[in-house]
């Protein structure tokens, strides 16, 4: 179910359009007729306002009829039934009959296979169809290609019986505001797709329930109270699941329930309340609580494990299918900023003060920054052995791992590991909390670095390293302690051993997901408490997991700690879990909360979405009781804070005295894939009529070399060689016989990839374009197709008589290129197979090296414009020459899509490395934001790396020791 709201697209203007009154004076109607007309007009107005308007990708606007939900259509006696309903109900009945007829010994494996098959049809089958529809509009192309919805009266529908069957099926289900013939093809395709979804979803749920029935039993020795408790909990989860589904359908209707936005959009805002304020993606998260309720009632680990597998498959469906479509459809990149980054002015100012990169030039003082720093080398989620923080973390973790594995699990070592974990937890919460509190009130951390001539950015970098090291070591020590306290169960079938491990692993997975969601919402800046260090204008937003919870780390962020308690079943781990939870809550209340109140004030939200949903469902008496409890808790917290504030000066004085005394005493004493499909019969196709001609932007200059032999050989070949710019679009003109197959296609390959000139044995990896429109079930195969089957006069290369052939033009650009240097060729293939009919002349794609011979690298004012001039065209190529992304000059900022898709920055750093011999991380390109900043960075890198440069340009090179 696509859960993102549709973007309004001018529907209000369409609904509110007024028709101009006639100039002719009409006679006044009688009063009764006038009142009747007014009531009719009012009714029509209300009806019009209640209508929903849809919009297809080509801009067609239509009225979206009202449809009923799946269960009502199938099971309600009042709803009209058609043949597809009878088919679905028959298949469901066959499932039930199969359960009753099978022997008890094979019921469980048979229904496990049946359920997993239907689940695969759901997550893999429907997922593939939706993926293809989202990216290539495949389902609509199939319908158009088969002419399913073309009226047979026109004589163009080859399937008139199927047309009448589909028409009868759909019009039976939608009796009002729907006409099969006039509905857009996208809407009709969606309705047919719905019927397939109904079959799969109903069979999926039915087979799951029947599998649970087959596995259901009462555990041996289970008491009546435990059984009643198990059934009560299971029934509650199933009822909760039912409420989630009903409330979700109330909010999103059939449009999102059946993934309607993969086919068309609706012109209205969808409001998300109820269950959508409770949890992210409720249909796929809390919406599967019923699976675990049924597992409880069945008292079967088989049902539990297959439920976990199905739930995991559903999350994979969400991540791989729905989320990319939602991101593409509703989260379009913002327009490009036309204002040059303020850092550019700073760079220019530095350049104007000093026109040369002299080594004795005094570096400018760091400029204090009050805005949020932009991360170019994220600390979380990346390991770089060139950073002292990462090396320190790696070495400490290796030490913990070695000590944990080598040492025995005796009581003494267990005590040591638990004590070590407790100390690290105290430091992580209390020690880090103290540093942040001092930073919030006095800027103590920043003042320390300013004292020694460093800037705020250096203080921020060092703080991130300290926090990252403390956090990772805290959890590493906890894992080591859990390992020492854990013992394998002697009998997995005894007691709740399996259940403890399953629940524990689930809680650990929940904490990992929560941490990832928090980092995704806060980013690097928020993860490391950046608002304690940078005083930017307070702007508080609640997105991601914070839409549902104010402090997710308070409960969900420590779920894995309690998961370890369940798995180890150890009192020592209970102590560590209680200590961790207590210190984390204290950190939130005593450090984070006061700083947030000081920084954001009244803009802080009191209740999160989950709390609001729960409060709305409470009766008035409980609401009043809850308000009283909140008041008591707030007053208690304020009292504790007052006590701490009062005692703080005395404690500080005592600590200072202790530090002074201790200091006095001490003074004394960190592949290739081979895919070949061949056409068996090529008779009737004139091979000499096939040809390929390559055109493109030729490289303006060749690499210079002092090697005279190489220069001579290059100059002799320049008239023959075709050398094209890196990333520039390549035009291919083709010819073929008039009877050539409409499924011919042209692919781009490296010359060295195919040894045969008759057969292509290597996959094009998506770098191919069809010669004719509509021949393949993919729109991406037509991206770059400019013309086809244009009849021209053709002589060929053998001076034969002139003959007529079909011709066309295609352009390879963007993802159709290899984005690499080398020698390439185009291959013309026959009838969707891999028979080669023609091969283009080989051509080379090369990145011209920056010429340093004639440019004085010591003069910044000269070298920077030269670098900008060399960078601009190749960066425009790397950004697909898209006017919304690629800059038109050195000062213009890159489009926001560069930050969202790493492929652009990877292309740029590849080009920079081969042009200038300097390797940058892709994040550097995003951080610089325009050509001028990147050129400034290259200039500095050239200066820093000059003693190690291997170029033959004038200037400093690597010193060579003379004998």
From Swiss-Prot:
Residues 107-109, 217-223, 299-300, 409-414, 488-491, 593-963 are cytoplasmic. Residues 38-52 have a biased composition (Basic and acidic residues). Residues 1-85, 131-195, 245-277, 322-387, 436-464, 513-571 are lumenal. Pfam families: PEMT (PF04191). Residues 1-59, 349-373 are annotated as: Disordered. It is a multi-pass membrane protein. It is found in: Endoplasmic reticulum membrane. It catalyses: a 1,2-diacyl-sn-glycero-3-phosphoethanolamine + S-adenosyl-L-methionine = a 1,2-diacyl-sn-glycero-3-phospho-N-methylethanolamine + S-adenosyl-L-homocysteine + H(+). GO terms for molecular function: phosphatidylethanolamine N-methyltransferase activity. Keywords: Endoplasmic reticulum, Lipid biosynthesis, Lipid metabolism, Membrane, Methyltransferase, Phospholipid biosynthesis, Phospholipid metabolism, S-adenosyl-L-methionine, Transferase, Transmembrane, Transmembrane helix. Its EC number is 2.1.1.17. GO terms for biological process: methylation; phosphatidylcholine biosynthetic process. Its main location: endoplasmic reticulum. PANTHER family: PHOSPHATIDYLETHANOLAMINE N-METHYLTRANSFERASE. HAMAP family: PEMT. Catalyzes the first step of the methylation pathway of phosphatidylcholine biosynthesis, the SAM-dependent methylation of phosphatidylethanolamine (PE) to phosphatidylmonomethylethanolamine (PMME). This is Phosphatidylethanolamine N-methyltransferase. The gene is CHO2.
């Amino acid at each position: 179910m696509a859960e993102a709201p549709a973007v309004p697209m001018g529907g209000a203007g369409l609904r509110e359009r007024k028709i101009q009154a006639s100039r002719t004076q009409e006679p006044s109607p009688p009063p009764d007729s006038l009142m009747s007309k007014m009531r009719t007009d009012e009714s029509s107005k209300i009806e019009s306002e209640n209508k929903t308007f849809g919009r297809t990708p080509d801009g067609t606007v239509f009225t979206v009829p009202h449809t009923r939900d799946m269960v009502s259509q199938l099971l309600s006696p009042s709803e009209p039934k058609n043949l597809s309903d009878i088919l679905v109900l028959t298949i469901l009945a066959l499932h039930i009959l199969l359960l009753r007829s099978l022997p008890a010994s094979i019921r469980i494996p048979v229904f496990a296979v049946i359920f997993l098959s239907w689940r695969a049809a759901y997550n893999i089958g429907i997922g593939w169809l939706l993926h293809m529809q989202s990216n290539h509009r495949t389902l609509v192309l199939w319908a158009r290609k088969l002419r399913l919805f073309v009226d047979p009266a026109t004589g163009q529908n080859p399937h008139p019986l199927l047309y009448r069957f589909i028409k009868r099926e759909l019009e039976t289900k939608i009796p009002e505001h729907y006409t099969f013939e006039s509905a857009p093809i996208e809407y009709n395709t969606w309705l047919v797709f719905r019927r397939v979804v109904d079959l799969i979803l109903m069979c999926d749920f039915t087979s799951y329930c029947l599998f649970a029935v087959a596995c259901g039993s009462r555990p041996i020795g289970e008491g009546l109270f435990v059984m009643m408790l198990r059934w009560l909990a299971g029934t509650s989860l199933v009822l909760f699941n039912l409420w989630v589904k009903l409330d979700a359908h109330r909010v999103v209707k059939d449009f999102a329930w059946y993934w309607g936005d993969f086919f068309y959009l609706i012109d209205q805002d969808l409001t998300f309340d109820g269950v959508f304020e409770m949890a992210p993606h409720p249909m796929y998260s809390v919406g599967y609580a019923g699976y675990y309720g049924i597992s409880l009632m069945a008292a079967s680990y088989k049902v539990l494990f297959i439920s976990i597998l199905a739930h995991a498959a559903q999350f994979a469906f969400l991540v791989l299918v729905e989320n990319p479509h939602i991101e593409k459809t509703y989260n379009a990149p913002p327009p490009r900023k036309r204002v040059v980054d303020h850092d550019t002015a700073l760079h220019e100012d530095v350049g104007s003060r000093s026109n040369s990169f002299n080594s004795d030039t005094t570096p400018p003082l760091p400029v204090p920054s009050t805005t949020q720093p932009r991360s170019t080398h994220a600390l979380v989620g990346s390991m770089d052995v060139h950073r002292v923080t990462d090396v320190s973390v790696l070495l400490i973790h290796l030490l913990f791992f070695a000590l944990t594995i080598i040492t025995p699990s005796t009581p003494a070592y267990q005590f040591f590991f638990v004590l070590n974990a407790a100390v690290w937890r105290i430091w992580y919460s209390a020690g880090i909390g103290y540093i942040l509190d001092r930073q919030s009130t006095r800027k103590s951390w920043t003042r320390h670095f300013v004292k020694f001539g460093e800037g705020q950015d250096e203080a921020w970098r060092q703080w991130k390293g300290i926090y990252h090291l403390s956090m990772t070591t805290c959890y590493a020590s906890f894992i080591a302690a859990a390992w020492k306290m854990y013992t394998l169960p002697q009998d997995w079938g005894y007691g709740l051993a399996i259940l403890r491990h399953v629940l524990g692993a689930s809680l650990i997975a929940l904490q990992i997901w929560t941490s990832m969601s928090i980092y995704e919402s806060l980013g690097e800046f928020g993860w490391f408490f950046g608002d304690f260090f940078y005083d930017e204008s307070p702007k508080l937003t609640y997105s991601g997991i914070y839409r549902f919870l104010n402090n997710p780390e308070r409960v969900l962020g420590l779920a894995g700690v309690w998961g370890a308690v369940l798995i180890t079943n150890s009192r020592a781990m209970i102590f560590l879990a209680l200590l961790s939870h207590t210190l984390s809550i204290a950190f939130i209340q005593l450090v984070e909360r006061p700083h947030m109140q000081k920084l954001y004030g009244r803009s802080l939200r009191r209740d999160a979405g989950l709390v609001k949903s729960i409060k709305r469902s409470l009766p008035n008496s409980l609401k009043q009781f809850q308000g009283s409890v909140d008041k008591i808790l707030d007053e208690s917290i304020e009292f504790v804070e007052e006590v701490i504030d009062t005692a703080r000066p005395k404690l500080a004085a005592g600590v200072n005295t202790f530090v002074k005394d201790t200091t006095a005493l001490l003074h004394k004493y960190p592949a290739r894939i081979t895919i070949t499909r061949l056409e068996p019969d090529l008779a009737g196709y004139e091979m000499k009529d096939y040809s390929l001609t390559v055109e493109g932007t030729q490289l303006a200059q060749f690499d210079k070399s002092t090697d005279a032999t190489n220069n001579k050989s290059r100059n002799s070949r320049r008239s023959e060689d075709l050398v094209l710019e890196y990333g520039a679009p390549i035009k291919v003109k083709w010819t073929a016989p008039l009877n050539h197959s409409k499924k011919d296609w042209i692919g781009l390959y490296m010359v060295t990839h195919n040894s045969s000139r008759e057969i292509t044995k290597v996959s094009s990896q998506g770098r191919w374009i069809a010669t004719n429109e509509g021949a393949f079930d993919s729109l991406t195969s037509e991206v770059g197709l400019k013309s086809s089957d244009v009849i021209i006069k053709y002589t060929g290369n053998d001076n034969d008589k002139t003959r007529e052939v079909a011709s066309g033009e295609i352009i390879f650009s963007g993802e159709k290129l290899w984005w690499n240097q080398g020698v390439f060729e185009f291959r013309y293939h026959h009838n969707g197979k891999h028979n080669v009919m023609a091969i283009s002349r080989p051509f080379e794609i090369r990145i011209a090296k920056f010429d340093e011979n004639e440019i004085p690298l010591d003069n910044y004012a000269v070298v920077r414009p030269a670098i900008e001039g060399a960078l601009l065209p190749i960066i425009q190529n790397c950004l697909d020459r898209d006017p919304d992304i690629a800059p038109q000059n050195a000062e213009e900022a890159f489009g926001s899509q560069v930050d969202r898709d790493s492929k652009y920055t990877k292309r740029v750093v590849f080009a920079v490395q081969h042009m200038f011999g300097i390797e940058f991380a892709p994040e550097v390109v995003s951080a610089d934001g325009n050509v001028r900043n990147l050129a400034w960075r290259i200039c500095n890198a050239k200066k820093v790396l000059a003693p190690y440069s291997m170029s033959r340009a004038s200037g400093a090179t690597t010193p060579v020791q003379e004998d």
